[in-house]
Amino acid sequence: MSWFGFFDPDFDDFFGRPRKYATEVPPNFNPRKIAQGDNGKGQQVSRYGAGAGHPHRALARRDDFFDDFWKNFSSGKYFVGFDDNVKTTEESDKYVVSYDQENLSPDEVNVDFDKQENELIITVTQETEKDGTKKSSTFHSNLKFEKPVNFDDISAEIGEQGVQVTLPKVHADHEKIVNIPISKAAAKK
């Protein structure tokens, strides 16, 4: 049995999912449970049961996943799970990423793009006050792309439902295929 045979790559791209990091240790934090969920009691539980398959494309991203996990952990960012607020749609000429969280203000959100890693980083910083005590929380959601992005033309908009980021591809998918015309050979004499 493979270490990574617990998911089906057609339905759950484990290593390619957007990850969420916090700058403070969450309650009941257990870094050993990388695939986590919430059982309604504030406790982390595994979302994945046993399964079959050995997805090769996921293995290609496996090393990046663990490298990012430890790189961020060493810099004071704690992996708190996969960010289900981030939704990605791939079109032939662009990626559209939406971060669904209501009532965000532009000063709470920062959108960065790492050109070297081809990675979008959405940072949300929120401050709350309760009983005279102020608390600041920062979450980082990271999303890597397989195809190169034209980073000079990236745009982001914020609305009532959250943030929408448009990332144009360097080459549209249909531009990768070139049609070669076929001519009829001249008849030999």
From Swiss-Prot:
Keyword Hydrolase: no
Keywords carried by this UniProt record: Stress response, Virulence
Alphabetized Pfam families for the sequence: HSP20
GO terms under biological process: cellular heat acclimation; cellular response to oxidative stress; filamentous growth of a population of unicellular organisms
Induction and repression of expression: Only expressed in stationary phase. Expression is increased in the absence of adenylyl cyclase and in biofilms.
UniProt cross-references to PROSITE patterns, sorted A to Z: SHSP
CDD domains noted in UniProt: ACD_sHsps_p23-like
Region listing for Disordered, in residue ranges: 26-53
GO annotations of cellular component type: cell surface
Domain sHSP: 77-183
Cell wall biogenesis/degradation as UniProt keyword: no
Signal peptide: none
Gene3D superfamilies given in the database record: 2.60.40.790
Function: Heat shock protein required for pathogenicity. Mediates thermotolerance and adaptation to oxidative stress and ethanol-induced stress. Required for invasive growth and filament formation under various filament inducing conditions. Plays a role in the capacity of damaging human-derived endothelial and oral epithelial cells during infection. Potentiates resistance to antifungal drugs, as well as resistance to killing by human neutrophils. Plays a major role in trehalose homeostasis in response to elevated temperatures.
Family designation: Belongs to the small heat shock protein (HSP20) family.
Entry protein name: Small heat shock protein 21
Species of provenance: Candida albicans (strain SC5314 / ATCC MYA-2876)
Gene: HSP21
